[in-house]
Amino acid sequence: MRRATPGLRHLLITLVLTACSAPSFATQLTVTDPAGQPLATVMVRERPADGPQLDTSDNGYPAPGVARAVAPEVTRFSDATGRVEFTERDASMEYLVRKPGYQDLAIKPEVETRELNVTLVPETDPIKLAEAKPASVWLGALDLGDRDTKLHFQTQCTFCHQQGNSFIRMERTPEAWGDIIHRMQRYGARLSSQDQRALPERLSAGYRKLRENPQLLADPLPWSPALTGITITEWPLGDIFSQVHDMLVAANGLVYVADNIQDRLYEVDPKTNRVTVYKIPHREGERNGGLLAARLKNFPKHDSTSNAHSLAESRVDGHIFITPSAQRRLVEFDPATKAFTLHEMDEGFYPHTIRVDQKDRVWFTVALSNQVAMFDRTTQRFTMYDLPTRGFREWLNTRYIGAVFKLMSWGVPLANWLPVDRAATGTPLPYGIDITPDGKVWFARLHTDEIGLIDPDSGKITMIATPFKGPRRLRTDAAGKLWITAFPESAIVRFDPATSQFTRFDLPLSPKGGDTPYALNVDRPRGIVWVNGNQSDSLYTFDITSETWANIPMPRRVTFTRDVEFEPDGTAYTAIAHFPGWHVEDGQSTLIRVQRP
């Protein structure tokens, strides 16, 4: 047995050595506490000791069109005996060991080993215990004065990133918070004018109070023994300037991921670990940033004229359709030939979430012009559905939103000049969309607290008020019921079109109210709803039949995800899409696969 070195701070590691001639080997870790008792539900992440070794030859990213093997990271959880095993790998590995309430441990064996005996030491420092808690705990405890203010803040200020992580909760003056809010308004937040004035002082004081009084922070719910048997695999994609937004598990077995900020489409083969990058083309003369050129003018590295956002696949020929939110067009990608086709639109602003219906028509929300678009592949023509507005001011703004952004691109700071109310009047924001089995088109409208229905046969539009704030993204289950995220309310909601009844299910969370579920998807064959837990660094699953929850913690802190996709066997995929990427632990965005036993 080796004695612990001072550098490990009393953490005991015993290495049982194997023959040095072994070319590859499996590794088993046994994790105990200082008394020698086994520790269950310990998260152990195995990763290449030399790092991901990514190709950065194309302005920091892989050269396009060249398939390269990427070594994934694998995470598993210890069983009741404290054991966790990893299959053999041909490269040297290191291990990151984590369990709430204990000190993290990083192990980089100097020799090849088949067995590692690891002792984790309980963390007793209240400050360090608080720092290790997920952002959802800090956000849930943050006092902003009243519930309505908190809900409005969570709706507008968790669009792109967490609130409460270590970067956000650091000491800032009210003036510094005011500068941040000013910049976020230009990025697209619609925080009300009154809250732009009031919140800088409250945020500065609120986070300071929590830092100085860690006893005010609740303990998150404990990790479940059911985590044993789950395997999480991560493929590193992009860099700290990337925003790998939505992804698609295609019928060809490959996974496609869009980098919104760098205009790249990643093609990942989960079986071979080979990754190929394709650059999304643009028209000659188009500016960096596209039609939204002023929005990210101060961002350090921005190589995008399209802002690739959401993806959907045709069931007929496997072509992939991509919404470029910074252009007035639809992008089509042929996975067989790798060719892109750009379909130009005559109107609309900010193509957003996309789906393909049973008749091979492509439907997507057009967020800032308050529309839903349909692209008929047979005729190659677009049909635009104008959604109702909440008055003349909103009609005027959505009608001429292109002119507003044109002025902003010329340096006129309209996003900071124009008054904003808590209803975000002027930007109703149609967001998520899905097609029910009967062919009806349903969408969510984030800022009006509504869902809507389009009958493709008649063109009739029906709007339905929701009994909750912030319906963001929605999906249908096998029975045609809709599942909707209540974004600022830490809940999901089921809507039955047959009865017009809403049923709410709160996320299993401590403290209540600290998470912002951005999106969800339904594994229809198994009746499981998967939910993105953006503040809690987790994915939630909800069994529709038993109405029971489970929580799967993700390996990295600051895991902010925006969608879930499935393989036919129910294996789930998501991707770290935090903006900015340098907030993420290790500064690395990844494609994530979750396999359950």
Each PLM stretch: what is its role?
Residues 255-260, 304-306, 313-314, 320-326, ...:
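Conserved beta-strand positions in repeat-built beta-propeller and related beta-rich domains
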Residues 50-87:
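Short, acidic Ser/Thr/Gly-rich low-complexity loop/linker segments typical of extracellular
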Residues 27-39:
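Structural motif
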